[in-house]
C-alpha cells in the first residue's frame, strides 16, 4: 500500500511512525495544486490537511481508495466525487474539541472584560495621564 502525505507541515512534527509502518510512505512538507497528481499517481491512500482534492484529481489517481484529512473540516475534498468513485474520506473527528471550547471561553471573557479596550488604554498612555487610578468609562462586569 502506498501512502502519500501532501502537507506534513500541518501536523507540526507530530510522530506518525504508526502510519509510516502501514505501507510505502512518502511525505511532503508542502504541495502545490500542480504537484498533487504527480505525487499521488500511484497512491492508495492520500493524507492532506489543506491541499484540495477535486473530481479531476481523483480521476487522475486510479489507485486511490482512501483520503484522510488531517483536520476536522473536509471542505477541500469533493465528497460527492469521492463517493461516486468509491473512495472513502475520513477526517480527524474531535481532535480540537477542548481547544475550541477554551477559545470560546477565552473570547467570551475577553469581550466581557473588554480586554482589547483596556489593552489599548494602557498602551496609548491614557492610563498614566488619568487623574485617578481607575477608569469608569466602561461598565464593569463580574461572573
Which positions does each model-derived feature cover?
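Phosphate-binding beta-alpha-beta segment of Rossmann-like dinucleotide-binding domains, i.e.
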Residues: 85, 93-143
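Short acidic active-site motifs
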Residues: 32-36, 52-57
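Short beta->alpha connector loops at strand-helix junctions that form conserved
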Residues: 29, 70-71, 87-98
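Rossmann-fold NAD(P)-binding glycine/threonine-rich loop
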Residues: 75-87
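A short, aliphatic-rich alpha-helical micro-motif
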Residues: 39-40, 58-61
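N-terminal glycine-/charge-rich "phosphate-binding" loop or analogous flexible N-terminal tail
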Residues: 1-43
Amino acid at each position: 500500500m502506498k501512502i502519500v502525505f501532501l502537507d506534513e507541515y500541518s501536523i507540526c512534527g507530530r510522530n506518525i511512525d504508526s502510519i509510516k509502518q502501514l505501507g510505502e510512505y512518502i511525505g511532503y512538507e508542502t504541495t502545490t495544486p500542480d504537484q498533487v497528481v504527480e505525487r499521488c499517481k500511484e497512491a492508495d491512500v492520500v493524507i492532506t490537511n489543506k491541499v484540495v482534492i477535486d473530481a479531476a484529481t481523483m480521476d487522475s489517481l486510479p489507485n486511490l481508495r482512501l483520503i484522510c484529512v488531517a483536520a476536522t473540516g473536509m471542505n477541500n475534498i469533493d465528497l460527492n466525487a469521492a463517493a461516486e468513485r468509491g473512495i472513502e474520506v475520513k477526517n480527524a473527528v474531535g481532535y480540537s474539541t477542548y481547544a475550541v471550547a477554551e477559545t470560546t471561553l477565552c473570547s467570551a471573557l475577553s469581550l466581557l472584560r473588554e480586554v482589547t479596550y483596556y489593552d489599548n488604554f494602557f498602551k496609548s498612555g491614557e492610563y498614566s495621564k488619568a487623574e485617578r487610578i481607575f477608569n469608569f468609562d466602561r461598565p464593569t462586569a463580574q461572573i
